[in-house]
Amino acid sequence: MDLKTLIREIPDFPKPGILFRDYTTVLKDPQGWRYSIDRLTELIKPLEPTAIVGIESRGFILGAPLAYQLGLGFVPVRKPGKLPADTHSVEYELEYGSDRLEIHQDALAPGDRVVVVDDLIATGGTASATATLIDRCSATLAGFAFVIELEGLNGRDRLPEVPIISLVSYD
């Protein structure tokens, strides 16, 4: 299936000069949505994860059904102040600013093998920050999985050397 035909492009969002790739148009298409989950499940399974980590918020949309399909637990990585227990926190740079992410300190344990899921990788800042959080939990990063990769922004270069899965790439 060619997911590119389902992904909407929105110029100058969230600020001028950014071309936003909108995955929500895939979510509303039953075949596109099913293909995304089924294909990512197929590609993630050989990495032998013990948990799926989803990055707020579109990583939740993908990560929860992937964890379910794989028979694994799902761990959310959230923006500050959204998790009720003790957290690890990291600041990171975005394509269009900076932010912080948090994970519960007890969300992962030594021996856990984690695949991080999000809808899109651009500069790699969010994914790299999430890798730092996984390390702070003493878990092992097994890989990353994205639906969309913006290759021209070289996000892969900021990530640890683990498998990186993407279903659609743009230059």
UniProtKB/Swiss-Prot annotation:
User: Does the record carry Cytoplasm as a key word?
Assistant: yes
Give the main EC class: transferase
Q: Which UniProt keywords apply?
A: Cytoplasm, Glycosyltransferase, Purine salvage, Transferase
> Where does the UniProt entry say this protein principally localizes?
cytoplasm
Q: Enumerate the catalysed reactions.
A: AMP + diphosphate = 5-phospho-alpha-D-ribose 1-diphosphate + adenine
The EC number(s) attached to this protein equal 2.4.2.7
Q: Which SUPFAM superfamilies match?
A: PRTase-like
Gene3D superfamilies for the chain: 3.40.50.2020
Kindly list the GO CC terms recorded for this protein. cytoplasm
Chaperone listed as a keyword: no
Which pathway is this protein engaged in? Purine metabolism; AMP biosynthesis via salvage pathway; AMP from adenine: step 1/1
Q: Which GO terms describe its molecular function?
A: adenine binding; adenine phosphoribosyltransferase activity; AMP binding
Q: Which domain of life is it from?
A: Bacteria
Q: Name one GO biological process term.
A: purine ribonucleoside salvage
Cellular localisation: Cytoplasm
Q: What role does it play?
A: Catalyzes a salvage reaction resulting in the formation of AMP, that is energically less costly than de novo synthesis.
**Subunit structure comment from the entry:** Homodimer.
State the similarity comment. Belongs to the purine/pyrimidine phosphoribosyltransferase family.
Q: What is this protein called?
A: Adenine phosphoribosyltransferase
Phylogenetic lineage: Bacteria, Bacillati, Cyanobacteriota, Cyanophyceae, Synechococcales
What would be the name of the gene that encodes this protein? apt
